[in-house]
């Protein structure tokens, strides 16, 4: 929305400077996007083309002799199609900066002919996007004077960025009203138009619509005997300053009303209208040649104004060329109507038409100004074009039913925290045109017809707040969050974050997969229950809520493999679903490894089969990943038990279940069953795991939140290897537990590094090799100390498992 400073001051009595006005506009929610003081236009002068001859070396160029008022014509080479003798336009001499092309002119030769300047187009001056020809001014434009002064370009132009909910500020009068309400001046009011009316308007209007909301009102008046010449200089200057091209007085008046009062108008040449006017839906395939010289094909979704011969206008969007007004117009029909905002928006989008009328109608114009707008336009036509006004015809309009809001003034403080007095709140609302009835802390507020965006109490609070000024809100320090008791994050949230970090530290990459999977995959992982089917899935293969993270991770890994990335290690920490109630949603940390993506060091260090013969991933990689999550989450690993076997999607002999006690299942790990991989259409070597973070027991509450000091031993750790021959039925975990119990203070870790079965060991026997890490605490251990500890380890394993030390 553009307007000049002088135009604004026609409606606002104020001594405020340009900077003060712009600052206040932004403060009250009308953000100033640009201010153009037009200083760059001062060097341009009005000049007349004395002669125009064809360029000797170029068919599309002309050699002009241009008089700038000093009696010394200068030679200019010009390529504009409308360049001709007698044309009056804007001249830029050598040394002048032309903003639209970002060039400072100099004397030069064009195809061998010297040129001493430039006749400019509107686009070259950044006035508009029109570059079809050079500026063509009226013949009586004063040659030799400043073009900026003549065109009103020395008047600062303010452009504000309007939000769609403020149709009242698509008028300069509406902007002035907001500024006056904010205390920056006084709103000027004009007397109601007064003129003599003679005779009836001979054209009737019929509304033939199946939905009255498409055109809630239509008013029409004839003015006979007009003289449609150029509009006065003051009007032309204002229109040109905001980027509009003056055409003739009648058209310029409608454009002026659009910006001045926010009331789009339209004029028909009465002589070109045949019979009465009908407002109706367009017929399928009907066409109209519009004022932009383009033909549009219409349909039943478009509302049109038609006479007996055909279409004359696309209602609320653009008029037709056939009934347009020109210098020969004697009798004019002035239209002021109301249109459905949604239909206008759809019509404009479907036809690709953007006009100032559409911009206002699709946001909503003031319904109560339909007839006053007609009166004001009639007054301007009589003043500028002469003539005799006929009686107005008004059809369809049933009046505006205003909204009334019961408004407790205490809402201002409740919703904003602002300390605004009741007197100021009421003064602001009255200044904005709201009707206020009642006294005390609760009043009845009538919303004005030009504010369709105001609907309830919160909207009224917003009006008070923006005019009072958000700058008046005193800064308040935030509360002291250090005084908050207890943890801000829940235990589950902390464990979720910890699991992510633990798996990332093992070289795995985090993935985010869909929570929706195909029904076949859901059933493969013990899901597919009717309660977990989506009523409206986004795709046919996303019909069920996932019972496990693994199908999504496996298919994601396969997509990577298909693109040449065969060694993949990815994880996800998210939700799975066992039922349709909140307690049936699980928080799970899951991951898979493919190919040779085994952890071979710290960080993202994977072994690679192509570089050194890395081994394929196996059940032990998945086990290590799963246990790392439990350990990072602070579970007592001595109480964690591992049992053989897992759900059906795992390999029956290469998988395990992680438990804490006989009933608490913490998760599963292992290699995947070949049938599972086949059903998912994935290939390769895979292992994976899932840990149920919500199944972990709550940590015991400690007396203090302070962590104990970290104690590090100054002595070197020592590792000892043992190989025990045990029955095949003995689990490795039992051996680890027995070895650890030999001395929990000195033994800091026990790991299995080899399992061997062979005839040399005997029937149903196996060898389990473990590595025991011994960390001295307060002294260096002697050989006697190690021998005693070794004997205790061997004795504990033999007692617990029946195992003997392998020779």
From Swiss-Prot:
Q: What Pfam families does the entry give?
A: B3_4 (PF03483), B5 (PF03484), FDX-ACB (PF03147), tRNA_bind (PF01588), tRNA_synthFbeta (PF17759)
Where it sits in the cell: the answer is: Cytoplasm
Q: What is its main location?
A: cytoplasm
Offer an example of a GO molecular function term for this protein: magnesium ion binding
Key words of the record: Aminoacyl-tRNA synthetase, ATP-binding, Cytoplasm, Ligase, Magnesium, Metal-binding, Nucleotide-binding, Protein biosynthesis, RNA-binding, tRNA-binding
Q: Which GO terms describe its cellular component?
A: phenylalanine-tRNA ligase complex
Identify the residues that the record assigns to the FDX-ACB domain, covering every copy: 713-806
Q: Which PANTHER family match?
A: PHENYLALANINE--TRNA LIGASE BETA SUBUNIT (PTHR10947:SF0), PHENYLALANYL-TRNA SYNTHETASE BETA CHAIN AND LEUCINE-RICH REPEAT-CONTAINING PROTEIN 47 (PTHR10947)
Protein name as it appears in the record: Phenylalanine--tRNA ligase beta subunit
Tell me the organism.
Agrobacterium fabrum (strain C58 / ATCC 33970) (Agrobacterium tumefaciens (strain C58))
């Amino acid at each position: 929305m553009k307007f000049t400073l002088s135009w604004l001051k026609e409606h606002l009595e104020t001594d405020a400077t340009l900077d003060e006005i712009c600052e206040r506009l932004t403060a009250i929610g009308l953000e100033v996007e640009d201010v153009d003081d037009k200083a760059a236009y001062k060097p341009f002068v009005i000049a007349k083309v004395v002669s125009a001859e064809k360029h000797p070396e170029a068919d599309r160029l002309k050699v002009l002799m241009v008089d700038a008022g000093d009696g010394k014509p200068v030679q200019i080479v010009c390529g504009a199609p409308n360049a001709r003798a007698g044309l009056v336009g804007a001249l830029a001499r050598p040394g002048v900066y032309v903003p639209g092309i970002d060039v400072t002119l100099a004397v030069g030769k064009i195809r061998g002919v010297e040129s001493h300047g430039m006749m400019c187009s509107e686009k070259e001056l950044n006035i508009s996007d029109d570059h079809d020809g050079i500026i063509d001014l009226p013949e009586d434009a004063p040659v030799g004077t400043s073009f900026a002064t003549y065109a009103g370009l020395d008047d600062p132009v303010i452009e504000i960025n309007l939000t769609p909910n403020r149709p009242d500020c698509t008028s300069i009068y509406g902007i002035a009203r907001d500024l006056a309400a904010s205390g920056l001046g006084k709103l000027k009011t004009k007397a109601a138009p007064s003129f003599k009316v003679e005779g009836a308007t001979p054209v009737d209007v019929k509304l033939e619509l199946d939905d009255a909301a498409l055109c809630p009102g239509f008013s029409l008046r004839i003015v006979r005997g007009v003289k449609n010449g150029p509009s006065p200089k003051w009007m032309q200057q204002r229109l040109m300053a905001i980027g509009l091209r003056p055409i003739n007085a009648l058209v310029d008046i409608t454009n002026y009303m659009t910006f001045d009062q926010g009331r789009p108008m339209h004029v028909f040449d009465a002589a070109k209208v045949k019979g009465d006017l009908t407002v109706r839906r367009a017929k399928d395939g009907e066409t109209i040649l519009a004022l932009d010289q383009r033909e549009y094909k219409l349909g039943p979704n478009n509302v049109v104004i038609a006479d007996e011969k055909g279409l004359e206008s696309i209602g609320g969007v653009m008029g037709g060329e056939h009934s347009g007004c020109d210098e020969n117009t004697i009798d004019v029909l002035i239209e002021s109507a109301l249109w459905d905002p949604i239909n206008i928006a759809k019509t404009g989008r479907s036809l690709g038409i953007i006009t100032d009328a559409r911009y206002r109608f699709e946001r909503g114009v003031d319904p109560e100004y339909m007839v006053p707008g007609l009166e004001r336009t009639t007054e301007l036509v009589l003043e500028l074009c002469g003539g005799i006004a006929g009686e107005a015809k008004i059809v369809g309009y049933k009046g505006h039913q205003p909204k009334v809001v019961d408004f407790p003034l205490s809402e201002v403080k409740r919703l904003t925290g602002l300390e605004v007095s009741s007197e100021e709140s009421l003064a602001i609302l009255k200044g904005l045109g709201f009707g206020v009835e009642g006294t005390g802390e609760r009043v009845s507020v009538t919303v004005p017809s030009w504010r369709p965006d105001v609907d309830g109490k919160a909207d009224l609070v917003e009006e008070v707040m923006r005019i009072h000024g958000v700058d008046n809100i005193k800064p308040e320090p935030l509360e002291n969050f250090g005084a908050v008791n207890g943890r801000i994050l829940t235990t589950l949230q902390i464990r979720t974050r910890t699991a992510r970090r633990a798996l990332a530290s093992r070289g795995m990459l985090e993935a985010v997969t869909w929570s929706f999977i195909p029904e076949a995959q859901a059933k493969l992982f013990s899901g597919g229950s009717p309660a977990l089917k989506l009523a409206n899935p986004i795709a046919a293969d996303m019909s069920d809520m996932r019972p496990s993270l693994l199908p999504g991770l496996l298919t994601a890994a396969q997509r990577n493999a298909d693109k040449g990335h065969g060694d993949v290690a990815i994880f996800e920490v998210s939700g799975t679903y066992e039922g349709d109630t909140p307690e049936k949603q699980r928080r799970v940390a899951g991951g898979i490894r493919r190919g040779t993506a085994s952890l071979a060091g710290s960080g993202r260090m994977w072994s690679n089969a192509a570089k050194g013969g890395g081994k394929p991933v196996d059940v032990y990689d998945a086990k290590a990943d799963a246990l790392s999550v439990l350990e990072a989450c602070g579970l007592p690993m001595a109480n964690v038990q591992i049992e053989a076997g897992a759900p059906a999607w795992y390999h029956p002999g290469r998988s395990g279940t992680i438990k804490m006690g006989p009933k608490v299942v913490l998760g599963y790990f292992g290699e995947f069953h070949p049938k599972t991989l086949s059903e998912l259409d994935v290939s390769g070597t895979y292992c994976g795991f899932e840990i149920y973070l919500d199944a972990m027991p709550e940590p015991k509450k400690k007396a203090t939140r302070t962590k104990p000091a970290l104690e590090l031993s100054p002595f070197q750790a020592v590792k000892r290897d043992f190989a025990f021959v045990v029955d095949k039925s003995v689990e490795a975990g039992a051996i680890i537990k027995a070895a650890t119990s030999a001395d929990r203070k000195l033994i800091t870790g026990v790991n299995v590094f080899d399992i061997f079965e062979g005839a040399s060991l005997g029937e149903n026997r196996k060898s389990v090799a473990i590595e025991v890490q011994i960390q001295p605490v307060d002294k260096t251990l002697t050989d006697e100390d190690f021998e005693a500890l070794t004997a205790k380890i061997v004795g504990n394993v033999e007692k617990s498992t029946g195992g003997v030390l392998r020779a």
